[in-house]
Amino acid sequence: MSKYDVIVLGSGPGGYVTAIRASQLGLKTAVIEKESLGGVCLNWGCIPTKALLKSAQVFEYLKHAGDYGLKVSEYDKDFDAVVNRSRNVAEGMSKGVQFLMKKNKIDVISGYGKLKAGKKVDVDGTEYSADYIIIATGARSRELPSLAQDGKKVIGYRKAMTLEKQPKKLIIVGSGAIGVEFAYFYNAMGTEVTVVEYMPRIVPVEDEDVSKQLERSFKKSGITIMTSTEVTAVDTSGKGVKATVKTKKGEETLEADIVLSAVGIKTNIENIGLEDVGIVTDRDKILVNDFYQTNIPGYYAIGDVTPGPALAHVASAEGILCVEKIAGHHIEALDYGNIPGCTYCSPEIASVGLTEAQAKEQGINIKVGKFPFSASGKASAGGNTEGFVKVIFDAKYGEWLGCHMVGAGVTDMIAEAVLGRKLETTGHEVLKTVHPHPTMSEAVMEAVADAYDEVIHI
């Protein structure tokens, strides 16, 4: 039986980053993976979807070339080539993880791993043992009883990335990050898209102003938005799909070629031996302490399978802290109140901290500032004037409570707010920090200036 210091079950952004950090700390490490290295994120999530979205963005620029003083007489899309480019990008990233495994002398064990008592893992009949076993098995597309996926007419996000034929009409159920990213992609490529959302507004976890802006932008692009709407049944017996939806006005039937279910994720914790070992779960999540230890000594869990936010960067951060604790380092628990969230539709969304509504619900006296990209020189020059930056501060102490952005490239801007909050930067300190001109990031400074009644450009 092969013996390791650390065995990581799963090789997504949680698993492979955990393994690399463990190896850096001098721990003999193995990773068990049943599919491709990199997990859902690199192969079926974060990375390939961004490749699809980039193709859509380039296609959009070609459509609007005249707005930039350019004449493009002929242009067209090749849907197969767009999909193939996305898959090639994903495969390249997975090979990159393979390289990192070799570089860091990490053993990669291919197969289905199942936990056993005594700090062991069975992989297709072969047993491996370790002093510490870290569960990082991630999650998959969640299915609703009224929206069972058949992989043909009712699909999940994986199939949506590799369709053989572009649908003329698409219904997307759910308007979280997955839903709105695919809504933008398919709409930009020429598909007639309808987004159905059960909650009163799209991207419901975001600040309400952000939701309103995205809905305006989507409607302007020709995307149909149906909020406070529930899909009660789907009929796939005909050529396409008929979806029965319940609205405030009653029931109606929507028709499309395909329905994409984007109603969240379900953790991959079944049939991995949790019950055999005695690891405690609650509502499909493995319960852990601040350092990701389960109730059974020697067994840890990170990423989507735990109660924290199901985000790749969270899984990576948790994994690093987990193995640093195992190695005896003195570490601080992760601050889950300062986790950025990014959505890569167009316009993009990025946020961190409290929304305005949440701050008010907590009874905090706040200062709120907002700066529209329509007043930004860089945004105007680039033709990307939709959206804004919104900041929220504690009125008494100047604490940066929240930052919410919607617009072109904002996912690359949010780190300023995350770092500022980490360092307990006050509003006045941000305001007095010189931002380069002309940049999109100036909007952060201007939004802060607006909160303190010192804004210059609006």
Give a label for each model feature.
Residues 1-12, 168-176:
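Beta1/beta-strand and adjacent pyrophosphate-binding region of the FAD-binding site
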Residues 2-4, 20-27, 32-166, 194, ...:
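Glycine-rich flavin
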Residues 7-35, 47, 51-58, 327-328, ...:
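Flexible, glycine-rich terminal cap/loop adjacent to redox cofactors
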Residues 7-9, 113, 128-138, 173, ...:
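Short hydrophobic core segments
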Residues 14, 38, 178:
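Hydrophobic/small residue at the entry helix of a nucleotide-binding pocket
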Residues 19, 23, 183, 187-188:
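Gly/Ala-rich phosphate-binding loop of Rossmann-like dinucleotide-binding domains
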Residues 48, 121, 267, 294, ...:
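Hydrophobic "anchor" residues
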Residues 151-166, 253-328:
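FAD-site-proximal beta/loop scaffold in flavoenzymes
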